Amino acid sequence: NEFLARWDLRPELVEVADGRPNLLCTVEGGSPGPHLLLCGHTDTVPLNETDPGVGFSGRVEDGRLWGRGATDMKGAVAAMAAALAALYQTGRLSAGRMTLAAVIDEEIESLGAEHLIRSGFQADGAIVGEPTRNRVCIGHKGLEWLEMVFEGKA
């Protein structure tokens, strides 16, 4: 939020759960065109007893950052925020819109992404910065919650 605001962008914090907002920030191009979503999550896998002492340290070793969420997915969210700020500052987004959505709770219930969808947010395309071992993925597994009722005789 502070990084984007420093670049004269207007990030918006949208409350999703108690004290846990999604961050949305949109840059408008100079003319109409497609809307691209840059999406990442701000939570991490919960700590457990088997973690190798890294936790939330943010330790830098041999020029690399080690710590919870460094690759999944704080690095991608930071890169997307920097890209959005650069496009805005240089005026290089000539058409369309680009929105950064940093959503909460991807690792447990996907509350942030669900809130974004239920709010009516729409885009023509999306880049999700999940780590993929440096391979471009054009699809990914997802989840769907269903409630079913069956009636009859067994």
What residues fall within each predicted segment?
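Acidic/His- and Gly-rich active-site-bordering loop/insert found
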Residues: 1-68, 89-94, 104
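Fold-level recognition of mixed alpha/beta catalytic cores in primary-metabolism enzymes, strongest
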Residues: 65, 71, 75-154
